[in-house]
Regions:
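Soluble, non-transmembrane catalytic domains of enzymes that act on hydrophobic metabolites at membranes
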Residues: 191-200
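Hydrophobic alpha-helical transmembrane segments
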Residues: 2-6, 96-98
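Extended basic (Lys/Arg/His-rich) segments that typically form rRNA-contacting surfaces
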Residues: 9
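Membrane-embedded catalytic scaffold of the fatty acid hydroxylase/desaturase
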Residues: 12-173, 179-189
């Protein structure tokens, strides 16, 4: 069951990346508006972006809760995705099903808390803060953990204070974290808006 749960977490992070990039942001089309297979979700998400750019990362929709159409859309979308994938994974692995349900709830918790407590977001999920407040909003697609942003080369760091302790986005002993970061930077290097100066 644990192997299935861990595999489900990896699949959920990959889905988070794909859904954020292709459904919530939509794909560029020359001379036309962006395309999303779920246009209402894209509309909701771009309104979310406009809101947080105006309010220094805070989203009042989460304060309003269920009565806010964007919050309601996010909750319903997560429930549908969790229901569909949980049902599909159940015959294969109950651990994967459990991880899908956990991941949907965790995504909502992390995303909501980040936009209610911007200082917490800067410390705990700087990749998502970078996604909204960086000059390039078409990068840093992961919300809960930056795994697939590193794997797919879309982690763009705007400043040293917005660089996570390590690419797993998990608190680890400093020695382990440093070794992991060094290895990942060799294999899957993050991009920088402006490369940090090396102090000799």
């Amino acid at each position: 069951m644990w192997k299935g749960f861990v595999a489900g977490l990896v699949v959920a992070n990959a889905f988070e990346w794909v859904a954020h990039k292709y459904i919530l942001h939509g794909t560029h089309r020359a001379g036309k508006p962006r395309y999303s297979p779920v246009p209402d979700s894209m509309k909701s998400h771009w309104e979310h972006h406009r809101e947080v750019r105006k309010t220094t990362f805070h989203d009042h929709g989460y304060v309003e809760g269920w009565s806010n159409w964007r919050t309601k859309n996010e909750i319903v979308s997560l429930a549908v995705v969790a229901g569909v994938f949980g049902t599909l994974f159940y015959p294969v692995s109950k651990g994967m099903t459990l991880s899908v349900l956990y991941s949907a709830g965790n995504y909502y918790y992390i995303h909501r808390r980040a936009h209610l407590e911007p200082d917490w977001a800067m410390r705990k999920i700087p990749w998502h803060y970078d996604h909204h407040m960086n000059s390039n909003q078409d990068a840093n697609w992961c919300v809960t953990k930056p795994w697939f942003d590193y794997i797919l080369g879309t982690r763009v760091i705007s400043s040293l204070d917005l660089q996570e302790q390590n690419p797993l986005g998990i608190a680890l002993p400093q020695v382990v974290s440093n070794k992991l970061t060094q290895w990942v930077n060799q294999v899957f290097p993050a991009k920088w808006v402006k490369a940090p100066e090396v102090i000799m």
